[in-house]
Amino acid sequence: NINSLKVHIVGGGISGLIAANILEKYGVKPIILEASDRVGGRLKTDIINGYQLDQGFQVLLSNYKAAQKYLDFDKLDLQKLKPGACIFVNGRPIKFGDPLRDPSLLLPTLFANLGTVRDKLKIAILNFKIQKKSIESIFKTPEVTTSKYLKNVGFSNRIIHNFFKPFFSGIFLETELKTSSRMFEFIFKMFGEGLALIPKNGIEEIPKQLKSYLMKTTFKFNSEVIKINNKKIILKNGEILKTNYTIVATEPNQMINNLKSPPFDWKSCQNLYFTTSKCIFENPFIGLIPNKESLINNIFYPSSIESNHKGKNELLSVTVVKEHEYSK
């Protein structure tokens, strides 16, 4: 009897919530075990001193097929970012973006001293080629590193340094662009076809919405799993849960003995928030810092988009991807 099955999902992030959604459709009543006090995983938002702070600068790309399948975009009250970036060269911001989706970016992009005219033409051609590829074909294409891929396409070192490196370092969370070219093509396609969006009430609105759809799922918060052994789940507080099936929707290496798959090499960044007297961008642009000596990779003003929680001053989000020796 499927209704009597005890199915536990370890992790209340996006993967865990989607797993519960699918199980409910088959009549299963899953139990989600979440180590923290709420759902969301890496998609969390805090309100501190009246400011709305996402835990990490994160955006939702409008053309993510899975997002379109499981989310109601209208209810998220999504705020649009400009389809481009402000790139700081010698301290001066230079606008660079997609004039096909925002005509106001045409002249700034044409005259942007970030690479050659040939580079800009190659970006347009690459965009056209990738839009014609299906996602399935992208992930079947022979892969190299993103860095090698860009050089193979024929981009100059200057455009790679000024645009591709800081932009994709902020996405891949690594500064050498060693990430697979398949992932580069996928992300490039998503940015080329859609827009970067942030929910008005913060990125945590995404998991909150997914949770609201779950009618048969039980949630156990502050329930950290330390070991999964056959039909038993052991929690950090010593509690032992009996289970028929367990879905691990989080880092599994510590809780499962003799895991056949190799340990995951997680990448990370540091996200800092500052208040400032003014926003230096007229519109919601991502700011890129292509300076090798700079600790900062990219910046964004959350106060440049609509929010239900705004403090007295402008809010600046700073992302650090580089490894460093600075302490807290």
Regions found by a protein language model. Name each.
Residues 24-48:
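Glycine-rich FAD pyrophosphate-binding loop
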Residues 15, 38, 253:
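Conserved Rossmann-like nucleotide-cofactor binding loop
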Residues 49-137, 146:
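Dinucleotide-binding Rossmann-like beta1-alpha1 core, especially the glycine-rich loop
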Residues 26, 224-328:
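Mid-domain catalytic core of redox enzymes
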Residues 5, 57, 243-244:
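Local beta-strand N-terminus motif with an aromatic residue
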Residues 5-32:
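N-terminal Rossmann-like FAD-binding beta1-loop-alpha1 element of flavoenzymes
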Residues 108, 125-227:
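Active-site/ligand-binding neighborhood in enzyme catalytic cores
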Residues 11, 80-82, 221-223, 229:
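Short loop/edge segments at beta-strand edges and connector loops
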